[in-house]
């Protein structure tokens, strides 16, 4: 049994006093009773749905609140954190010690004299490189969320649990002094890397706790040479590991969910001396327009112990997954074992030998697959490119480019080149190859078919792409295969999909110019400058 007196003393050391009761690492059964009990109001209230899962609302915060994210500027962080600047705007805004202390006082005062849920878990399935994290909240469903998302310790591990990091969730409290303190609003998500504490105030969005801890892993791991990556990962029957990077809408979840391979995880991973490991003990999947036919694994995972966020629940308790009236960002969290085809008992495997960067190029320029050199790997990893089609008033669809460093700029705490250095070092040690896979459009005006994309992924995973004769795509200087089994050869060189190759040329020059302009911000250090030659020639 865990010594609750010890837990209470540790809460007092944080500034949380006179706690009425500590509900420590509650079971799923307990959490179900707590979050559906009569008398709960507002955003604390859970609604039982016909799926068996409980649904909750998070109010106006239906996504993360990056404008309210701050990190304390101190001796430890001043020269390590990738601070926001005029040339490279990001979400790492500095906060002084006095403001931090006032926010900490607000949250600890809110949590004092209450009945609290304390959940201890691990972030990271590597015994050597995990963070022991403690989450303190007065809201039952928030305890449920973190029980789903973090790795659940054994009884034995809980006996002597010493938290490395504490998340204090005070979503009911806001900051009245935000204007004088020069903050963005009364809501806050603040980190102190020296005290190893995250404070949450004002926002009820569950993802702040999950993404907060992945931002912390993104700080601590690369500083000791361990990769920290926003990617999905799976492993084949022979133990061969593949990792998939990609922004939203590129097919990261779909392509890594493969009946022939076991899933390691769908979102956040580390790469240490043993291999690839999941940061999480659960999945946080989007549910808008979810159907059993299109995504059977996720659909079946929504059952008892899963937690739905911001979905529309009909009067009979059924869920309308097509209704995005509260938000398009409807979500479900569930423990990873709700998915059948996963790595057991621990979400980790050996070193990755295939690294896949997914992009959905709406400009119709990039090839469906290209093999990257180590320098190109760093360049395209730092660029983190994808593009969406957005309609304009006149009905013309204009591509909108997105460049997100390391395919996850919002969660990077260090300079992006540090993640690229660690990734390529790990790849070289493992003899891994990198590929850029375009799941977007080509000169036909149509999206590359899922059948062809799956054929490309299969050719990468089974090694047949290594035997293919290669050509080179000009401007981007990318190596492209001339033929692959099960893939339409007519699409492999994007120039061949245009009736007039000059059209590809002008689009390619335009896109190359965008890459070059975006990369200027990385040329502020020597590593970044050295990579310019690996990019396209505008």
Curated annotation (Swiss-Prot):
Entry's EC annotation: 4.1.1.49
Binding annotation for Mn(2+): 211, 230, 267
Keywords noted in UniProt: ATP-binding, Cytoplasm, Decarboxylase, Gluconeogenesis, Lyase, Manganese, Metal-binding, Nucleotide-binding
Pathway note: Carbohydrate biosynthesis; gluconeogenesis
A GO BP annotation: gluconeogenesis
Record-level Gene Ontology MF annotations: ATP binding; metal ion binding; phosphoenolpyruvate carboxykinase (ATP) activity
Binding site for ATP: 211, 230, 246-254, 295, 331, 447-448, 453
Localization annotation: Cytoplasm
Residues at which substrate binds: 64, 205, 211, 331
Listed Pfam families: PEPCK_ATP (PF01293)
Catalytic reaction list: oxaloacetate + ATP = phosphoenolpyruvate + ADP + CO2
Cofactor binding note: Binds 1 Mn(2+) ion per subunit.
Cofactors demanded by this protein: Mn(2+)
GO cellular component: cytosol
Complex and partners: Monomer.
Family, similarity comment: Belongs to the phosphoenolpyruvate carboxykinase (ATP) family.
Functional note: Involved in the gluconeogenesis. Catalyzes the conversion of oxaloacetate (OAA) to phosphoenolpyruvate (PEP) through direct phosphoryl transfer between the nucleoside triphosphate and OAA.
Record's protein name: Phosphoenolpyruvate carboxykinase (ATP)
Species lineage: Bacteria, Pseudomonadati, Pseudomonadota, Gammaproteobacteria, Pasteurellales
Recorded name of the encoding gene: pckA
């Amino acid at each position: 049994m865990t010594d609750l007196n010890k837990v209470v003393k540790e809460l007092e050391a944080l500034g949380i006093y006179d706690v009425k009761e500590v509900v420590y690492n509650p079971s799923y059964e307990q959490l179900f009773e707590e979050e559906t009990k009569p008398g709960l109001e507002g955003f604390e209230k859970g609604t039982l749905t016909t799926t068996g899962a409980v649904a909750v609302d998070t109010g106006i915060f239906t996504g993360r609140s990056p404008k309210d994210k701050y990190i304390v500027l101190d001796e430890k962080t001043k020269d390590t954190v990738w601070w926001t600047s005029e040339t490279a705007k990001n979400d790492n805004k500095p906060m002084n010690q006095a403001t931090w202390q006032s926010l900490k006082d607000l949250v600890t005062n809110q949590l004092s004299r209450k009945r609290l849920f304390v959940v201890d878990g691990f972030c990271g399935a590597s015994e050597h490189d995990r963070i022991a994290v403690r989450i303190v909240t007065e809201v039952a469903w928030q305890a449920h969320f973190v029980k789903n998302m973090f790795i659940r310790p054994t009884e034995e591990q809980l006996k002597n649990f010493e938290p490395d990091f504490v998340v204090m969730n005070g979503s009911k409290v806001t900051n009245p002094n935000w204007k004088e303190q020069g903050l963005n609003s009364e809501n806050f998500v603040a980190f102190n890397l020296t005290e190893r504490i995250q404070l949450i105030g004002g926002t009820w969005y569950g993802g702040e706790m999950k993404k907060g801890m992945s931002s912390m892993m993104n700080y601590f791991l690369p500083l000791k040479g361990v990769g920290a990556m926003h990617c999905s990962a799976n492993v084949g029957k022979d133990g061969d590991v593949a990792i998939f990077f990609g922004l939203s809408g590129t097919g990261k979840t779909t392509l890594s969910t493969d009946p022939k391979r076991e899933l390691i995880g769908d979102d956040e991973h580390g790469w240490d001396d043993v291999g690839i490991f999941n940061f999480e003990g659960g999945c946080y999947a989007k549910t808008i327009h979810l159907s059993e036919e299109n995504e059977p694994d996720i659909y079946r995972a929504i059952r008892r112990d899963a937690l739905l966020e911001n979905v529309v629940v009909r009067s009979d308790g059924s869920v309308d997954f097509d209704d995005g009236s509260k938000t398009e960002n409807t979500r479900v969290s569930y423990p990873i074992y709700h998915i059948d085809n996963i790595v057991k008992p621990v979400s980790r495997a050996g070193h990755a030998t295939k690294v896949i960067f997914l992009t959905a190029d709406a400009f119709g320029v990039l090839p469906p697959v290209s093999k990257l050199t180590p320098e190109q790997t760093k360049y395209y990893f730092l660029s983190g490119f994808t593009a969406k089609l957005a309609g304009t008033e006149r009905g013309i669809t204009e591509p909108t480019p997105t460049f997100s460093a390391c395919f996850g700029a919002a969660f990077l705490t260090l300079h992006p080149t540090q993640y690229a250095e660690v990734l390529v070092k790990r790849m070289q040690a493992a003899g891994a190859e990198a590929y850029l896979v375009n799941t977007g459009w080509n000169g036909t005006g149509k999206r590359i078919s899922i059948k062809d994309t799956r054929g490309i992924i299969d050719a990468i995973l089974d090694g047949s792409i290594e035997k293919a004769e290669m050509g080179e795509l000009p401007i981007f200087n990318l190596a492209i295969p001339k033929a692959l089994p099960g893939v339409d050869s007519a699409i492999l060189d994007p120039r061949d999909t245009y009736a007039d190759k000059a059209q590809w040329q002008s689009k390619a020059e335009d896109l190359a110019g965008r890459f070059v302009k975006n990369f200027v911000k990385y040329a502020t250090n020597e590593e970044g400058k050295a990579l310019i030659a690996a990019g396209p020639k505008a």
